[in-house]
Amino acid sequence: MKNLHIMEWYDKYLSIYEKPYSEVPQTVVEGCRERLAKLQSYEPLVSIVIVAYNEERRLPACLWSLSEQQCKYPIEFIGVDNESKDRTAEIYQAFGVPYYTEHQHTCGYARQCGLNQAKGRITMCIDCDTMYPPHYIELMVDNLQQPGISAVAAMWSYYPNEDHSKLQMKMYEFFRDCYLKIQNINRPELTVRGLAFGYYTENALKEGYRVELLRGEDGSMALSMKKYGKIKFVYDKRCRVITGYGGLKEKSILAAMWHRLKFYGVGRLFSKTDHYEDAPDNFLKNK
C-alpha cells in the first residue's frame, strides 16, 4: 500500500524551492507578477519588506507565496537586494517587485534600508528563504492593531526533507515551541525572529536597527519595541511560516535540541532584563 501524502499549503512552493532560477517555469513567474501587481497599493497600510542576499534558489518560492496573500488591508511590497552576486536582483525585476540595493552587508543594514522606504503605517519583515501561508499578513495585522500591542511575531516550522522526517520535525518543534512559549513570558525579544515579525513603522524609524550587528538585529529591534507596548506572539497555525534549514545547522534533531538547551540554558526563562551584553565577535568589521 502506498503512503498517503496529505497535501500541505506550501507543497507547491517547495516544487521550486532550492532550484536554480533557470528551472522556475515561466508560467509561475508570470502568474506571480500579475498577482503581486494587483496587490501592490500606492497608499498602503502595510509595507512588506523582503530582504535577500544571494537567494536565487529560494526567493521565487517566497514571492510565489506572497503573491497569494488574501488580505483586506492595502499593502505594498518592497524588495531589498543586499548586493547579491547571483540573480536575486533579476528575480525581483521579473516578479515586478520594486527593490533597492543595500551595499553594506548585514541583515540590519538590509532591514533598515527597507524600513526607510516603507510607506505603510505598519511594516512586516519577510525573509526570502521563507514561505508564508495565505492569511499570514492579514492575521498578523489584525493582532498588531489590538490595544496595547507594539509588535507581533509568529512561530515557524521547517519543511521535511531527506535528513529530517516530518515526525522528527514535529517532535523537535513541539519541545522547541514549549521552550519559546515559556521564554516569551519574561523575554519575548529573545523569541522574535525576523522572518515573522511586524511593528509600527514610525516607532521602528525612531529606534532604528542596530546595523553593526552580524546577528540579532531582529531581537534588538523587538527589545526597543517594548517601550511602546507589548510584543504579542500569534500562535494561530494560519500564521506559522515555513522556512529552510539555515538556522538549524545540526543534522540530528536530538543534537539540535541539546545544543539549544546547553547554549541558552533555562535560567533566563524566569527573569526579565532590558539590557544584553554584545558578544565581541558579533560586530561588523570595518574593511
Where are these regions (language model features)?
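N-proximal low-complexity "stem/linker" segments adjacent to membrane-targeting elements
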Residues: 1-65
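Acidic helix N-cap motif at the loop->helix transition within catalytic regions
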Residues: 57-60, 84-93, 135
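A conserved acidic beta->alpha catalytic loop
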Residues: 65, 81-89, 130
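Glycine-rich, basic loop-to-helix element that forms the pyrophosphate-binding segment
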Residues: 102-118
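Short aromatic/hydrophobic "clamp" motif used to bind/position activated sugar donors
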Residues: 123
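Conserved donor NDP-sugar-binding/catalytic core segment of glycosyltransferases
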Residues: 135-166
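Short, flexible, basic/aromatic active-site loop/helix in glycosyltransferases
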Residues: 154-160, 168-190
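Acidic donor-binding loop at a coil-to-helix junction in glycosyltransferase catalytic cores
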Residues: 215-221
